[in-house]
């Protein structure tokens, strides 16, 4: 579990670094915090670069809507993952009046907890400010997974709704094809209208 957690933190830092290269601003404090956390969640290079990223990169090469939905899911997953990391940290107990060792041993966990809370806050802010629509859609998809498949009433109602759902899905598919054709025609028309310079 610790290895997958560390991989996730590495992927978060990689994603944030990639975003920075693309022009997004990552606060210096956030970069430093991630580096501090990577020191705590230290894994070998063999584990870090084993060719199996926590989050696949393929969805990021698709259409913008797909990328936005995927990144909304990634941010939601990071919220859950960082929450799990916080739960796994040992609870720090306040030191007794004569004890100094409790203070020294609790300091790294307190720092890690503070750093994780900061990163969690930043991820939540990004998700709520820029991925509201995707969050709603993802919640709807999660709700679909919670449908009780073995319930007779649910089965009957689902059959009743199938005609409408099937028609909607078919028309969406057709609309997408039509939009592609229109875009292709517009591009071809622009090519024809644009005079070639000799």
Curated annotation (Swiss-Prot):
Gene3D superfamilies reported for this sequence: 1.20.1250.10
Gene Ontology biological process: immune response
Protein's cellular compartments: Secreted
Induction comment from the UniProt entry of this chain: Strongly up-regulated in response to viral hemorrhagic septicaemia virus infection.
Superkingdom of source: Eukaryota
Glycosylation sites: 31, 42, 174
Biased composition (Basic residues): 178-198
GO CC, alphabetical: extracellular space
Region feature Disordered, mapped onto this chain: 173-198
Alphabetized GO MF terms: cytokine activity; protein homodimerization activity; type II interferon receptor binding
Signal peptide: 1-23
Keywords per UniProt: Cytokine, Glycoprotein, Secreted, Signal
SUPFAM superfamilies: 4-helical cytokines (SSF47266)
Function: Cytokine which binds to interferon gamma receptor 1 (ifngr1). Also binds with lower affinity to interferon gamma receptor 1-like (ifngr1l). Has activating effects on macrophages and neutrophils.
Quaternary assembly: Homodimer.
Family, similarity comment: Belongs to the type II (or gamma) interferon family.
Name used for this protein in its record: Interferon gamma
Source organism per UniProt: Paralichthys olivaceus
């Amino acid at each position: 579990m610790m290895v997958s957690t560390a991989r996730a933190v590495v992927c978060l830092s990689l994603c944030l670094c990639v975003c920075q290269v693309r022009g997004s601003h990552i606060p210096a404090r956030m970069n430093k915090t991630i580096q501090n956390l990577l020191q705590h969640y230290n894994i070998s290079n063999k584990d870090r670069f084993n060719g199996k990223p926590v989050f696949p990169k393929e969805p990021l090469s698709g259409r913008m809507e797909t990328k936005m939905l995927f990144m909304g899911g990634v941010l939601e997953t990071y919220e859950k993952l960082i929450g799990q990391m916080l739960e796994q940290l040992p609870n720090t107990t306040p030191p007794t009046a004569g004890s100094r060792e409790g203070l020294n041993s609790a300091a790294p966990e307190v720092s890690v907890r503070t750093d994780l809370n900061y990163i969690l806050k930043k991820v939540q802010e990004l998700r709520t400010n820029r991925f509201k629509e995707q969050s709603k859609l993802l919640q709807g998809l999660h709700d679909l997974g919670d449908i009780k498949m073995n319930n007779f009433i649910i089965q009957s109602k689902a059959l009743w709704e199938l005609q409408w759902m099937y028609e909607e899905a078919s028309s969406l598919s057709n609309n997408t094809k039509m939009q592609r054709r229109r875009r292709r025609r517009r591009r071809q028309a622009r090519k024809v209208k644009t005079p070639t310079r000799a």
